[in-house]
Design a protein with these regions (language model features):
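Secondary-structure end/capping motifs
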Residues: 245-326
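Short, low-complexity disordered leader/linker segments with a strong preference
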Residues: 1-46, 343-344
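Short, glycine-/small- and polar/acidic-enriched structural segments
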Residues: 2, 38-177, 181-185, 194, ...
């Protein structure tokens, strides 16, 4: 009887040891999977991202989603269209989303307001204004002086699209307050419909909306705003400082996927990129997407890497200051966290 008890105890002990070994092995495999990008289905982490608008201007992001770059990093992305930088930042600060994707000016404003858990920019996607200036009338030989006396829909005050446009006007000898009518009464996501309904002589819109307007004879692209400026941190990813601190691995994997997306758009043709992102734009013809991407490649809008330079950040603050929207300059090393973008 005693021998039987000892035998049973021995068997139980062996089972326990084997079970513990299997658990440890499985844990190591899972950790290896996350680190290598080959993540088991049940270990994929869902991340909610609020984007400022839905545009092919952000092609590297959609490439990363559609070609599985995020999945390789163990992440599943849920995109929410915030409809403007203010809405995006509100969603981030109120913990409705994990990550915001908008102009970095939003992070500057929050820092300057003195928030203790302010937001940090951890990756930059675009380095130029991506909006196209669309005219109601066809213009064969456009110059910026033609905007004098005109009614223009440039976006909301305080946003990078508006301030960059204002900066370009000044660079071309136009006084934004006296020489034309910059109508800021219409919200960002309502500008296109307002223009189509008859409001304004010109409107600034992103692709593929600009090319769609042209195809439907509702407007004509006369200039790319970004072609008239130096490099400026136009669109970036940010999150609350506490989120970044508590989710370093997640943020690192997120940035890795964005790097892959940037590498793809900078090494492939417009047609290849269009085919990679078409599922993100089910209502847009592939030819329009291709044309829109060609426009963006022509003016070199996408970063080579997600790193934000101090020089471009300072130019952004100069533009904001000249627009009368910034009382004090925010420190680069507080608002921008390049540690993840500089990895590898």
């Amino acid at each position: 009887m005693r021998r039987l008890i000892y035998t049973l105890i021995s068997i139980i002990a062996v089972v326990i040891v084997i079970t513990i070994a299997l658990i440890c092995k499985n844990g190591n495999l899972n950790n290896h999977a996350i680190n290598s990008g080959d993540t088991p289905e049940n270990k994929v982490q869902k991340i909610t991202v609020s984007e400022v608008t839905h545009s092919v201007f952000y092609a590297p992001q959609y490439v990363a989603i559609n070609l599985g770059f995020f999945k390789e990093e163990g992440l599943e992305i849920e995109l929410i269209n915030g409809g403007g930088a203010n809405n995006v930042m509100t969603a981030v600060l109120s913990n409705q989303v994990d990550i915001g994707f908008a102009g970095p000016e939003a992070a500057i404003y929050v820092y300057n307001e003195g928030a203790s858990d302010y937001t940090e920019v951890f990756a930059q996607l675009t380095k130029r204004d991506g909006s196209m200036l669309v005219s109601r009338e066809k213009i064969s030989d456009f110059n910026w002086g033609m905007l004098k006396g005109k009614h223009i829909l440039p976006g909301r005050t305080g946003g990078v699209p508006y301030m960059t446009f204002e900066y370009v006007l000044k660079q071309n000898g136009i006084n934004p307050k006296e020489d034309l009518n910059l109508d800021t009464s219409i919200s960002f996501d309502a500008m296109t419909s307002a223009f189509v309904s008859g409001t304004g002589d010109f409107v600034t819109v992103f692709e593929p909306t600009a090319s769609s307007l042209e195809l439907n004879n509702q407007g004509y692209i006369v200039a790319a705003v970004g072609a008239s400026t130096e490099e400026i941190p136009y669109t970036s990813y940010f999150a609350k400082k506490s989120y970044i601190e508590n989710n370093k691995d997640t943020v690192s994997h997120f940035v890795n996927a964005i790097k892959k997306g940037l590498n793809y758009v900078n090494s492939h043709t417009a047609s290849e990129i269009a085919n990679a992102v078409v599922s993100s734009f089910p209502d847009t013809d592939i030819d329009i997407l291709t044309k829109a991407i060609e426009h963006y490649k022509e003016i070199d809008v996408w970063n080579e890497t997600p790193v934000m330079s101090k020089e471009s950040f300072e130019l952004l603050q100069k533009v904001i200051t000249e627009a009368g929207e910034l009382d004090k300059v925010a420190p680069f090393d507080k608002v921008v966290n390049n540690s993840f973008a500089q990895e590898h």
